[in-house]
């Protein structure tokens, strides 16, 4: 009897160190993402794209693919709407639109706050790019100025909210964030003091809303 107890105890302890596969879920559209009704897979891998890759080809910060499955890779590139790997969520930039602008290919990191989704991507369009405009580019102008501006945009990130009805992206600037913080005067007061609408600023307020909603 004692031998069985010892054996079970050893198995229990060793089980704590067994490798655990990450939960991987693919969502075909926004409805599936909202309702958490996706397809579970086990072979996906996430790769952070380099700055040079983004500068040359545009698109999101992450490439998500699988090994030796061309059909699934094609689906991930062109048709898949979003992917969740454990607690990390990514949306397919190919599916996103901000006014008449597109975000290219690959995937963008996404936050789930309340019943809304916010993804982090390069600034596009006049409203967004104004938040990341390099002062050097404004001074120089011409081809050199354009090159500096393009390089600055590769590194710049802002947040967009996915409209749950239309699926289109809405830029999350200070005005939008102020509306989201309605009912939290202390956070609104802090936001008024901010000098930037960049992602590294806005993420603090999105995280605060996440905590308040828990």
Where does each model-flagged region fall?
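Aromatic-patch recognition
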Residues: 24-187
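Bacterial Sec-dependent N-terminal signal peptides
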Residues: 1-26
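C-terminal partner/receptor-binding element of secreted or periplasmic proteins
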Residues: 178-214
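General "foldedness" signal
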Residues: 10, 15-19, 173, 183-186, ...
